[in-house]
């Protein structure tokens, strides 16, 4: 098979991947946990220790000062701030994509989402220089 045949197969493969959706591309090109270095005021409780402990094909990643289940297809910095259902009172930071800034919010101490940082510096380090579509 000549180079034009290989090129045709490559184009067909790319089109097939686009039609099949993310499932096939995730299998071929698995996403990895983020590698963001942060200075933590304290180590947070780990939510998981292995990928299989995470629901819905999420991955167990070191993120925001502890191990957390992350959906690698969803950008943490695009999530809204979520207080969670518990009634503790922790001042935390979240990234506001609309205003391109980090702001404080009160976290109840459980659940919520991963757009939840110990400090403004960690929030900015994770989200500020991202390019959003």
Swiss-Prot record:
Q: Which SMART domains match?
A: KU
Tell me the GO molecular function terms: serine-type endopeptidase inhibitor activity
- Cited Gene3D superfamilies: Elafin-like, Pancreatic trypsin inhibitor Kunitz domain
Q: Cellular component GO terms, alphabetically?
A: extracellular space
What Pfam family is a match for this entry? Answer: WAP
Sequence ranges assigned to domain WAP in this UniProt record: 26-73
Keyword annotations: Antimicrobial, Disulfide bond, Protease inhibitor, Secreted, Serine protease inhibitor, Signal
Q: Which Gene Ontology BP annotations are present? A: defense response to bacterium; negative regulation of flagellated sperm motility; negative regulation of peptidase activity
Stretches the record annotates as Interaction with SEMG1: 102-133
Q: What is this protein called?
A: Eppin
Organism source for this protein? Macaca mulatta
Record gene name: EPPIN
